[in-house]
Amino acid sequence: MEVLYSLSKTLKDARDKIVEGTLYSNVSDLIQQFNQMIVTMNGNDFQTGGIGNLPVRNWTFDFGLLGTTLLNLDANYVENARTTIEYFIDFIDNVCMDEIARESQRNGVAPQSEALRKLSGIKFKRINFDNSSEYIENWNLQNRRQRTGFVFHKPNIFPYSASFTLNRSQPMHDNLMGTMWLNAGSEIQVAGFDYSCAINAPANIQQFEHIVQLRRALTTATITLLPDAERFSFPRVINSADGATTWFFNPVILRPNNVEVEFLLNGQIINTYQARFGTIIARNFDTIRLSFQLMRPPNMTPAVNALFPQAQPFQHHATVGLTLRIESAVCESVLADANETLLANVTAVRQEYAIPVGPVFPPGMNWTELITNYSPSREDNLQRVFTVASIRSMLIK
């Protein structure tokens, strides 16, 4: 994997910097590195493809070295270099796609394609110029079964989940109380509602709770907590739990009371925040517990009082909500991230070349299914293909 990264980094720099008019002295180190790459690759044959619709391609390396000059690089020099650069880039692209297309239930973090296995051989270790990539560093650690640490911004840690729980219900669905939520990506939105606005609740207060368990623990997380759940702030028709009917939800938004968020790790509370909104920090956690209250306003203007009558029918439904959004965090496991295109790149390659469903990844790389059942085998394979996708993205946009 380190060789693949070094090849890609060298080719990217060569493509960007070996241009007509450039002083040779400004790129002499790069050209020496480029020539070292050619010397190491010359005389070797590779084969890529042969899975799904990814065509079999054979690659032979027999290229001349780039020379030295005392002056600027001229058109002929650059043209000769370009021919070599384009062939190498095409090769790297196909090695990456071949690797992305493959998976294994055992030791899925190791190279799976014939070409990358060959590049991992001892004879190619001289191509090892720059391994500063976060993905390469963590791949090396994972390959040795040591602790990794990926920094994510808006990590897709929550599988998609949208549902409701009714704590009070009737066949007519005209006096309901409960919670509804939408968990997806890096965000949780949860709302507590009571059609009667807590008229018969103890002290006119309804208590709500929402617990979310993560598939992998996060550390040093920066989180935004807001006293609102905008996705549940407008009228909607909702299917009943048994699917036999539908019920009407017409929210009127109140501010939640006694808001508390707890971050737990292995059942132990690590951080707790009470009535604190905006930016909060969570040190280490695998579970989030949100609790909040709906309090019937003790004093109401006539207009507000008309919204929340003492008896049915209840045409407006008192609602309070919270939004919790993970802005950035560190995870020991690789994840999809809204700020990165790695999952999209991997999925696109597998779809474009009709890669058959294998023993590890779900059909279509369905992220909700993948993260819901995030096995060690999936984690290993995902780290490998994401590392390869990050390497490929240096050359192929």
From Swiss-Prot:
GO cellular component terms attached to this protein's record: viral envelope; viral intermediate capsid
Predominant cellular place of this UniProt entry's protein: virion
Domain of life: Viruses
Cross-referenced SUPFAM superfamilies: A virus capsid protein alpha-helical domain, Viral protein domain
An example molecular function term from Gene Ontology annotations: host cell surface receptor binding
Residue ranges crossing the lipid bilayer per the database entry: none
Positions annotated to bind Zn(2+): H153
GO process annotations (BP): fusion of virus membrane with host plasma membrane
Classification via InterPro entries: Capsid_hemagglutn, Rotavirus_A/C_VP6, Virus_capsid_a-hlx_vir
Localisation per UniProt entry: Virion
Keywords per UniProt: Calcium, Capsid protein, Intermediate capsid protein, Metal-binding, Ubl conjugation, Virion, Zinc
Pfam family, one: Rota_Capsid_VP6
Binding site for Ca(2+): N266, D286
Entry PTM: The N-terminus is blocked.
Keyword Calcium: yes
Region (Interaction with the inner capsid protein VP2) residue spans: 62-73
Subunit structure, as described in the record: Homotrimer. Interacts with the inner capsid protein VP2. Interacts with the outer capsid glycoprotein VP7. Interacts with the outer capsid protein VP5*.
Further comment found in the protein's record: The VP6 trimer contains a zinc ion located at the center of the molecule. The zinc ion is not essential for either trimerization or transcription activity of the DLP. Zinc-depleted VP6 has an increased sensitivity to proteases.
HAMAP family from the UniProt entry: Rota_VP6, Rota_VP6_A
Similarity section: Belongs to the rotavirus VP6 family.
Role of this protein: Intermediate capsid protein that self assembles to form an icosahedral capsid with a T=13 symmetry, which consists of 230 trimers of VP6, with channels at each of its five-fold vertices. This capsid constitutes the middle concentric layer of the viral mature particle. The innermost VP2 capsid and the intermediate VP6 capsid remain intact following cell entry to protect the dsRNA from degradation and to prevent unfavorable antiviral responses in the host cell during all the replication cycle of the virus.
The name this protein goes by in its record: Intermediate capsid protein VP6
Organism expressing this protein natively: Rotavirus A (strain RVA/Human/Japan/YO/1977/G3P1A[8]) (RV-A)
Lineage, broadest ranks: Viruses, Riboviria, Orthornavirae, Duplornaviricota, Resentoviricetes
